[in-house]
């Protein structure tokens, strides 16, 4: 009784412009490009329906639950200025649609099948508001910024890193030697490249051993705590944990994971292991551009960054603003703040669609990496501030005198920039002069 079969417009149930969002709702901002002839209200409602409780037709089992309680709602639409037939659709999802502590489940719903939907030419998730009621169900980063500084005993400046190159092809012994040279020269960290896992020319266990030797030797010589991001990414979760465990047994302070290729389930598993065992966790974002590079389809990196803060990681690559990889300055700074700060106000000029309150979830250090070198140090110090990791790969190893002098050059330049900034000098204007003085 009361059930009427047939296909209905989504907007009859899922477009609700008078809906008042709740504190506990997960809010999403989608950039939609509807197919010609599809009204934006229908497209927005379709997104809300297909990413929550809806399907293409009315089904009798709808009567067995309270759809009003569980459905996603498109509660606002705005045309994108300067773009033809593009709209921002705001969708509110009730909290009960999602499993607690699972980024995997969150993404399966919100960025699942709906992205292949016929009524849309393109769809991009621009931002998500994660309410405290949901974020409190996650452990988040294993340690966070303050605990990391305390573990490393390094304060008042950005941390320095370097990716060992050539990224593939070195033997474990030569790899360890390159690590030692860089750390001895003054870097805080060296890094496995994201595609170094356990290949025929260098098996993971051999690499871990020679790197541990380099760590202990450079620590003894410099009196500073040193780290190398040992990449634990593997084909199975069990193998990944085996590698992390061996790193812990060797006394290494930090391991690494490729969180998008490894997957959120594996990443969250590793983040829990790292907190339980006192390891820091460095996150690389290989594959992100497949998802975030198109301006009208996919997902913005700020969403992937928020997802990582929930899933867990102490460092994450965040572009550079100045190097070889793409990144717009204000927008990059927007998601850098979303990674580090506890409370971030809505600010559309920086691409932040919602005010985000992380409550007590620890912060993540943004890593600037990709085509940067010594002459970028003033700009990077100014843009990223102290709570960041600056990673010069070719910018260290490409030094004409070798790795250790390259590392010395980076450390000297960084300390000169930090000192000049602390003395009130204008790095944007005087940066090159500051570095020239430091080299004398």
From Swiss-Prot:
Which InterPro entries would you find in this protein's record?
A: RuBisCO (IPR033966), RuBisCo_large_chain_AS (IPR020878), RuBisCO_lsu_C (IPR000685), RuBisCO_lsu_C_sf (IPR036376), RuBisCO_lsu_fd_N (IPR017443), RuBisCO_lsu_N_sf (IPR036422), RuBisCO_lsuI (IPR020888)
What keywords tag this UniProt record?
A: Calvin cycle, Carbon dioxide fixation, Chloroplast, Disulfide bond, Lyase, Magnesium, Metal-binding, Methylation, Monooxygenase, Oxidoreductase, Photorespiration, Photosynthesis, Plastid
Residues annotated to bind Mg(2+): 191, 193-194
Which Pfam families does the annotation name? RuBisCO_large, RuBisCO_large_N
Is-annotated flag, keyword rRNA-binding?
no
Entry PTM: The disulfide bond which can form in the large chain dimeric partners within the hexadecamer appears to be associated with oxidative stress and protein turnover.
Q: Which GO terms of the molecular function aspect are on file?
A: magnesium ion binding; monooxygenase activity; ribulose-bisphosphate carboxylase activity
Compartments reported by the entry: Plastid, Chloroplast
Which biological process terms from the Gene Ontology are attached to this UniProt entry?
photorespiration; reductive pentose-phosphate cycle
Report the top EC class in one word.
Answer: lyase
Q: What else is known?
A: The basic functional RuBisCO is composed of a large chain homodimer in a 'head-to-tail' conformation. In form I RuBisCO this homodimer is arranged in a barrel-like tetramer with the small subunits forming a tetrameric 'cap' on each end of the 'barrel'.
Q: What exactly does this protein do?
A: RuBisCO catalyzes two reactions: the carboxylation of D-ribulose 1,5-bisphosphate, the primary event in carbon dioxide fixation, as well as the oxidative fragmentation of the pentose substrate in the photorespiration process. Both reactions occur simultaneously and in competition at the same active site.
Q: How does it assemble?
A: Heterohexadecamer of 8 large chains and 8 small chains; disulfide-linked. The disulfide link is formed within the large subunit homodimers.
Question: What's the protein name?
Answer: Ribulose bisphosphate carboxylase large chain
Q: Which organism is it from?
A: Ptychomitrium gardneri
Highest lineage ranks of the organism?
Eukaryota, Viridiplantae, Streptophyta, Embryophyta, Bryophyta
Q: Which gene encodes it?
A: rbcL
């Amino acid at each position: 009784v009361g059930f009427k079969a047939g296909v209905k417009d989504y907007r009859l149930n899922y477009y609700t412009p008078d809906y008042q969002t709740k504190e506990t709702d997960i809010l999403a901002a989608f950039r939609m490009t509807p197919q010609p002839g599809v009204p934006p209200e229908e497209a927005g409602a379709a997104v809300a329906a297909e990413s929550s409780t809806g399907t293409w037709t009315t089904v009798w089992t709808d009567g067995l639950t309270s759809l009003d309680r569980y459905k996603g709602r498109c509660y606002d639409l705005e045309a994108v200025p300067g773009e033809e037939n593009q709209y921002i659709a705001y969708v509110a999802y009730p909290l009960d649609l999602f499993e607690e502590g699972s980024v995997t489940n969150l993404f399966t719903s919100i960025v699942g099948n709906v992205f292949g939907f016929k009524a849309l030419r393109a769809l991009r998730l621009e931002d998500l508001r994660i309410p405290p009621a949901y974020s409190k169900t996650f452990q988040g980063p294993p340690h966070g910024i303050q605990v990391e500084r305390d573990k490393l005993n390094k304060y008042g400046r950005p941390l320095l890193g370097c990716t060992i190159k050539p990224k593939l092809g070195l033997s474990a012994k030569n790899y360890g030697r390159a690590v030692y040279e860089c750390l001895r020269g003054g870097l805080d960290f060296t890094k496995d490249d994201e595609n170094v896992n356990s290949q025929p020319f260098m098996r993971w266990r051999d690499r871990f051993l020679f790197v541990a030797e380099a760590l202990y030797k450079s620590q003894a010589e410099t009196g500073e705590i040193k780290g190398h991001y040992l990449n634990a990414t593997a084909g199975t979760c069990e193998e990944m944990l085996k590698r992390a465990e061996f790193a812990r047994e060797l006394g290494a302070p930090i391991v690494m994971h490729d969180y998008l290729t490894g997957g959120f389930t594996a990443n969250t598993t590793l983040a829990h292991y790292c907190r339980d065992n006192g390891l820091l966790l460095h996150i690389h974002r290989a594959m992100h551009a497949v998802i975030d590079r198109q301006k009208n389809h996919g997902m913005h990196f700020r969403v992937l960054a928020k997802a990582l803060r929930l899933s867990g990681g102490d460092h994450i690559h965040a572009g550079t603003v100045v190097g070889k990889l793409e990144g717009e300055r204000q927008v990059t700074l927007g998601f850098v703040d979303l990674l580090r700060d506890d409370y971030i106000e809505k600010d559309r000029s920086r691409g932040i669609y919602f005010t985000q309150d992380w409550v007590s979830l620890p912060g993540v250090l943004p890593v600037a990496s990709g085509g940067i070198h010594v002459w970028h140090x003033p700009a990077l110090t100014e843009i990223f501030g102290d709570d960041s990791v600056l990673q010069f790969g070719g910018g260290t190893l490409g030094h004409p005198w070798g790795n250790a002098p390259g590392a010395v050059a980076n450390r000297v330049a960084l300390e000169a920039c930090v000192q000049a900034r602390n003395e009130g000098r204008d790095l944007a204007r005087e940066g090159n002069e500051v570095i020239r003085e430091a080299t004398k």
